[in-house]
Amino acid sequence: MSLLTEVETPIRNEWGCRCNDSSDPLVVAASIIGIVHLILWIIDRLFSKSIYRIFKHGLKRGPSTEGVPESMREEYREEQQNAVDADDGHFVSIEL
């Protein structure tokens, strides 16, 4: 029983590929998709934390305050802080 597959065949003491239809557009497209998938997977593994952080929080860190008077900016900051402080009351301390 041989361990050789249909693709791998010994040719004159070397291993070769018996792929006569490798110029088929479907084979070429599948190869390109496979290579792109591999590259994207490697990039994802290397930079996953920074990529997901960008998608989660976006590139901006909040609404633009350009052209807004300082008094309105301060009022907005206070409203945001009050909203955060109000949410603290929703947490329940469970002691076992």
From Swiss-Prot:
| Oligomer and partners | Homotetramer; composed of two disulfide-linked dimers held together by non-covalent interactions. May interact with matrix protein 1.
Keyword Cell inner membrane belongs to the record? no
Q: Which GO terms describe its molecular function?
A: channel activity; proton transmembrane transporter activity
**Which Gene Ontology terms of cellular component type are present?**
host cell plasma membrane; membrane; virion membrane
Q: Which residues lie on this side of the membrane: Virion surface?
A: 1-22
Query: Biological process (GO) annotations?
Result: symbiont-mediated suppression of host autophagy
Q: Transmembrane stretches, by residue range? A: 23-43
Q: Which InterPro entries match?
A: Flu_M2
- Name the residues annotated as site: Seems to be involved in pH gating: 41
Q: Which residues lie on this side of the membrane: Intravirion?
A: 44-96
What is the annotated localization of this protein?
Answer: Virion membrane; Host apical cell membrane
Q: What is the protein name for this chain?
A: Matrix protein 2
Membrane topology field: Single-pass type III membrane protein
What does the UniProt keyword field contain?
Disulfide bond, Glycoprotein, Host cell membrane, Host membrane, Host-virus interaction, Hydrogen ion transport, Inhibition of host autophagy by virus, Ion channel, Ion transport, Lipoprotein, Membrane, Palmitate, Phosphoprotein, Signal-anchor, Transmembrane, Transmembrane helix, Transport, Viral ion channel, Virion
Extent of Basic and acidic residues compositional bias: 71-80
Asked if the keyword Transmembrane belongs to this entry, the reply reads yes
HAMAP family per UniProt? INFV_M2
Activity regulation details: The M2 protein from most influenza A strains is inhibited by amantadine and rimantadine, resulting in viral uncoating incapacity. Emergence of amantadine-resistant variants is usually rapid.
Glycosylated residues (UniProt): 20
Q: Which family does it belong to?
A: Belongs to the influenza viruses matrix protein M2 family.
Q: Where is this site: Essential for channel activity, possibly by being protonated during channel activation, and by forming the channel gate and the selective filter?
A: 37
